[in-house]
Amino acid sequence: MKLIVITTPQFFEGEAEAVTSLFQNGLVMPHLRKPGASAEEMGNFLQQLPMEYMPRIVTHEQFQLASVFGLKGIHLNGRNPQIPSGYKGHVSRSCHSLEEVLKHKSDCNYVFLSPIYDSISKEGYSSAYSCDTLQKAQQAGIIDSKVMALGGITLEHLPEIAALGFGGAVLLGDVWQQAKEAFIPHFLHLKQL
């Protein structure tokens, strides 16, 4: 099962070092999500990361940076719903309903489905799906290896996410809300499952 980590919405001091540390400890593919950040701000952040990791990063904003920095790809969402003209690389997308998954899954490398559980990082962002609904979606072939679970994912949820047939889990609050000394040990524990 894939583990994807999304950055926090705002830049923070030491973030480049934290993301680099995640890479060094086995993070395969982070998603750079900075709503409202300028291309310059995002470019400055990317320049703080070792160049060897650029081909593993997916950006949610400022899609032109994908070619400038040789990033893995782009992630479509409500703010940026269209693939740029001429773009041929990796594409993922946020989906907030099973209908959206059906509509977009075949056009993407994978999609995020959310919120699976009550969000850790977004107050009032509650689970949208019952376990029964998710099981039926799996049986119908809607949830499969191209669908990543997002929203309130914690260590305790990973076995259920796997049993429901998701291809992976997308983490945000559970990773970034860890104390500095627990940050990497927690990520390594998540990776073991």
Question: Which residues make up each language-model segment?
Answer:
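N-terminal active-site wall of soluble small-molecule enzyme domains
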Residues: S21-F23, L27-Y87
